[in-house]
Amino acid sequence: MKIGILSLVLHTNYGGILQSYALQTVLERLGHEVYVFNREQQYDKTRWKYIPKRFVKRIIGRDVVIFQEARYKKEAPMICQHIWNFRKKYIHEYIIKSFDDIKKMNLDAIIVGSDQVWRPCYFKSQWNVGIENAFLSFTRDWNIKRVAYAASFGVNDWEFSDQETQLVAEAAKLFSAISVREDSGIKLLKEKLNLNSIQVLDPTLLLSRDDYVKLIEKADIGKSSGNLLTYILNPSSKKTTFINEVAKAKGLIPFSVNNSNVKQTAPIEQRIMPSIEKWLQGFNDAKLVVTDSFHACVFSIIFNKPFIVLGNHERGNARFDSLLKLFDLHDNLVVNLDSYSFERILSSRIENKKIEELRIKSIQFLKQFI
């Protein structure tokens, strides 16, 4: 079958890129021709938000925002070069200007997922369309199979307006099957849309550690600079202090797989993002991981590494709760940094049988409905 994957927009998000890569890979191994929808790189996403400020700044001669956008547009190819190279090499992207462009592909099926594709604030801002499109409303009159794989709402609450709820309810009726990433998603779909669904694994968990090690080996990169991997999406002084205390208590050397400096005033060499393979290498080399990222937790599990996850309410705690419950690792979640005992022994060993059972169940879902 010829299949298209609709997720969030691909740019530089490590987890987002790898989950699309993983789902594409699994589907190809099942014998399908697969494409991942993406849009042309947008540099001016803040345009409308800043119109009043821009007008004032133009009048007084300090058009800071416009200059920042122009600078980013110029520098992005260098800052993002390694990540974009991975996408170009491994992901079969189909660039669209609007969802109408998809019709001419003559697809047999579209899979929605994974990632927080059903979180309105993310999907609408990234694709610049209504959330009903995440439920394939634009395919209403198409002869096509519609399936959701590990789609995520990201949170436990229903973030749709009444009008949006009505629109997605109509669109969702056309799906052949729906699976979600979090157990809370099952409840939301039943309560709000009266739809049945099942829980499946994030696509990245459908591939083995060996699959990711092969990517690392192909890239031929050096060892990481430490053994305490830190991957923090929302940095703060409290988190930095916490990481330093963990390193001291465990006798480990912290290292990061973020770019070393995110300030726009920093030299561009310091803002170049590590490659996907370098990011994966970090998990392979780590003895312990500290993160506030969902997919960093996932890859800690894949590489069988102990990890500490710092609760990240802004990005959706439901994802962490569901994942940790699935693998009985809820003790790894830290909500209050001030009360953490640095002598705690963290779980890292997950029975291979448990992962394999969930993997078989998840792949069987794809085999059955695609």
Where are these regions (language model features)?
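Active-site anion-handling motifs in enzyme catalytic cores
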Residues: 1-370
